[in-house]
C-alpha cells in the first residue's frame, strides 16, 4: 500500500453554489457522519502514518474526524487543493452554469475546456509531486483533483469515469484503481 486519497465528506451548501476554493464551506451533518464512518473503515483496512489534507475547511474537517480513529500527524498542503474549474464558475449557483458550453465540456471531457486557470495536467503534476514525496499517507482532497491524479497516473481512457463520491477512498493496487466506499 502506498498512498490513499479520500474525498472530503458532503458539504453544507443549501444555496447549491459552485464553491470551488471559496472559504467557509463546512461539512454537513451527513458529511460528518461519512467522515467518521470511513475513518473506522480506514483503520480496519490500512496502515496510515500521516494525513495530508487540502487547506479548505471541508477537507480539514474530514481529516480531523478521520483522525479520531487513526491518531496520526495531520499536515496541510496546497498541492491537493481543489481544482478551480472553468473561469467564472466559482460562487455561482449550479443552475447558472449548467447551460454553459463549459459545463457541457465538463460533463463530457473536462480536458477540452479552454477557460481554466489551471489545466488538469498541472493539477496532476502538483499532486504527483506530493505523492512521490510521501508513503503510507491518507490524502484528503477533492473530486476533480483526485480524479486528475488517477486519470493521468493510470492513463485512463475517459476522465469522467471513476470520480470519487463523498468519502470514497481511492488507491492504486497492482496497477488498477481500487475504491473503498461507505456502501
Positions of predicted regions on the chain:
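Generic beta-sheet signal
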Residues: 3, 134-144
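Conserved beta-strand termini and adjacent loop/short-helix elements that scaffold enzyme active sites
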Residues: 6, 77-79, 180-182
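Active-site-proximal alpha-helix that buttresses catalytic centers in soluble enzyme cores
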Residues: 7-74
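Short aromatic-enriched loop/helix-cap "lid" or pocket-rim segments at secondary-structure transitions
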Residues: 15-18, 63, 86-90, 152
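Phosphate-handling substructures
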Residues: 26, 68-126
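Short, amphipathic alpha-helical "lid/cap" segments that border enzyme active or binding sites
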Residues: 32-39, 120, 124-131
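Short, active-site-adjacent cap segments at secondary-structure transitions
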Residues: 58-60, 83, 145-147
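Domain-level recognition of soluble alpha/beta enzyme cores
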Residues: 156-183
Amino acid at each position: 500500500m502506498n498512498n490513499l486519497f479520500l474525498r472530503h465528506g458532503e458539504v453544507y451548501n443549501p444555496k447549491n453554489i459552485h464553491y470551488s476554493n471559496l472559504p467557509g464551506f463546512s461539512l454537513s451533518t451527513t458529511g460528518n457522519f461519512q467522515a467518521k464512518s470511513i475513518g473506522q473503515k480506514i483503520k480496519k483496512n490500512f496502515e496510515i502514518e500521516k494525513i495530508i489534507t487540502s487547506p479548505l475547511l471541508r477537507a480539514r474537517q474530514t481529516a480531523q474526524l478521520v483522525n479520531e480513529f487513526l491518531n496520526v500527524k495531520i499536515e496541510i498542503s496546497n498541492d491537493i487543493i481543489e481544482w478551480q474549474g472553468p473561469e467564472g464558475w466559482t460562487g455561482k449557483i449550479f443552475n447558472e452554469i449548467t447551460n454553459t458550453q463549459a459545463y457541457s465540456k465538463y460533463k463530457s471531457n473536462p480536458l477540452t475546456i479552454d477557460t481554466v486557470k489551471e489545466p488538469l495536467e498541472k493539477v496532476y503534476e502538483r499532486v504527483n509531486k506530493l505523492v512521490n514525496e510521501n508513503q503510507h499517507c491518507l490524502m484528503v482532497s477533492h473530486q476533480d483533483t483526485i480524479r486528475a491524479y488517477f486519470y493521468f497516473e493510470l492513463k485512463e481512457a475517459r476522465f469522467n469515469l471513476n470520480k470519487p463520491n463523498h468519502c470514497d477512498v481511492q488507491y492504486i493496487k497492482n496497477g488498477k484503481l481500487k475504491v473503498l466506499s461507505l456502501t
